[in-house]
Amino acid sequence: MPEYTFLVVEDSPTMRQLISFALKRIPGSTIVEAGDGIDALKKLSNQKFDVILTDINMPLMDGLKLVSMVRNDPTYKDIPVIVITTEGADDARERGISLGANAYVSKPIQTQDLLNTVNEIIKSKA
């Protein structure tokens, strides 16, 4: 069974738990959580991840800055990134994709939509 390690970057503990709980449905998954982009970069420097899922609106370092930094770092640039946006936040979603995000999921998060998006990313990476 393949194993996947996901980095969930979200400032809301409730939303982080919701996303992590959904990802646990993927067999062989390990989930690591970060509360903002700075925390995410620390975790990236210490562990290998298969997919990063990041909220856009966060304190200290937002998800758009994180996407940009990941894409511009040779160590992390090939890790798929899924941005999580508020429904109707078309500008932020488009900016995330233009900065190099592979996909997006809108809030409120529908578990099946999240899992479908993650599974598509995993399959394309294989």
Regions found by a protein language model. Give the residues of each.
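Receiver (REC) domain active-site loop signature in two-component systems and cognate sites
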Residues: 58
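Two-component/phosphorelay signaling modules centered on CheY-like receiver
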Residues: 13-32
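Active-site T/S-Asp motif of two-component receiver
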Residues: 53-55
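Acidic, metal-coordinating helix/loop segments flanking the phosphotransfer/catalytic sites
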Residues: 33-51
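C-terminal output helix
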Residues: 109-118
